A protein has these predicted regions:
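Substrate-recognition/specificity elements adjacent to catalytic centers across diverse enzyme folds
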Residues: 1-225
């Protein structure tokens, strides 16, 4: 491929196991090629998950995803990006810029060569969007995990004065007797406190399931997990 953005020639060698190995003479070229290869291998997946993280699914999949988009946008970082980048390593922004430039380089090639474009884009009737370095750090919902579900569950047990059930269901190592801090009322947590959290981190649902049914399924799954 001939692409703009590299300081010199770089290589991607795919071994017999399908593992790509990147060779470049410049530190930032490595990240450029890594982004290019990620897009070459899974452009539709990363485009979909970027849209999921930024709350842009309804733009391509319809109004049934508005609720999930709304939830996702509650977790998108909206602070000052200059200060945010300063909180990372000295060259973190340049690394992210190189990586996303590599993604964009493949997107441009794929748009000019339809055979390289994943078939899912044609099936769903849209094209991949370009990336910015800020996208990499603004998206937070992809990193959300399950601890908050456990915390809410414990609070509800505490509200019912049944904290002993927590130890029977989920053993702690070393053993620990949880006590409700003085002045803390665990009963004030609203029933719907997890709704936006679960929607924001939910996988993309292509079944056209109504938002309330999707949320009910997510709540049931979270309860069983």
């Amino acid at each position: 491929y001939q692409v703009d953005g590299l300081s010199a020639t770089a290589e991607i060698l795919v071994d017999e196991y399908g593992v790509p190995h990147i060779y470049a003479n410049d530190h930032y070229d490595v990240f450029f090629v890594q982004g290019f290869n990620a897009a070459r291998d899974r452009l539709w997946q990363i485009d979909l998950w970027k849209r999921r993280g930024l709350g842009q699914l309804s733009e391509i999949l319809g109004e049934q995803h508005v609720a999930q988009d709304t939830a996702a946008r509650m977790f998108v970082y909206r602070g000052d990006m200059y200060a945010e980048w300063l909180a990372y390593g000295n060259d973190a922004k340049r690394i992210a810029e190189s990586f996303t430039a590599g993604i964009n380089a493949f997107v441009k090639i794929a748009k000019a060569n339809p055979d390289l474009m994943p078939v899912e884009f044609a099936m769903l009737g849209y094209e991949p969007s370009l990336w910015s370095a800020d996208d990499v750090v603004r998206i937070r919902s992809n990193g959300l995990w399950r601890n908050v579900v456990t915390e809410v569950w414990r609070a509800r047990l505490a509200c019912q004065d049944q904290m002993e059930l927590a130890a029977q269901w989920l053993a702690l190592e070393p053993q620990w007797q949880t006590e409700t801090p003085a002045g803390l009322d665990p009963c004030v947590i609203p029933e719907n406190v997890l709704d936006n959290y679960l929607l924001a981190k939910a996988p993309v649902d292509f079944s056209a399931q109504p938002p309330q049914e999707q949320l009910a399924s997510l709540l049931e799954q979270a309860t069983h997990d």
